[in-house]
Amino acid sequence: MKRLLLSLALAGGLAACAPSLDAPPPSACLVGAPYLTAQLFFGRSVAGRVPVSDAAWQAFVDGVMTPNFPDGFTVLDAQGQWRNPQTAEIAREPTKLVIIGVPRDAPLRARIDTVTSTYKQRFAQQSVGIVVADACAAF
């Protein structure tokens, strides 16, 4: 019984640490400096064609991603799912998730636009998912 009560107390304490979706971004960082994080979701299926190959992806990273984000980024393999807005069909495809962190005052939008528009054009993609959030970072 004591273990159950302790587990419930710890779970409640951890839940209290979760950020509120309605809370404004923190004005000061406890660690590091104010940053923006961007998550870019690159689908690798191409309608009616062979999916974007590893070699084609790496060429895109080397020629487009790296020049736009020379300080670094992280690439993860993922499996994506989304609803096509024109057909309402569910699409599932292999995905590359790219996570980028930049200082809060760095120009981000133009670089993201360059990367995503190049990917869409080069690989006949309808869209690239983008999530941008405030963060604190230290390296």
Question: Over which residues does each language-model region extend?
Answer:
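A compositional/biophysical signature of low hydrophobicity enriched in polar/charged and small residues
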Residues: 24-25
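Terminal, regulation- and interaction-focused segments at domain boundaries
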Residues: 31-54
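Mature extracytoplasmic domains of secretory-pathway proteins
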Residues: 56-95, 100-104
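Solvent-exposed, acidic/flexible segments
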Residues: 50-54, 58, 105-112
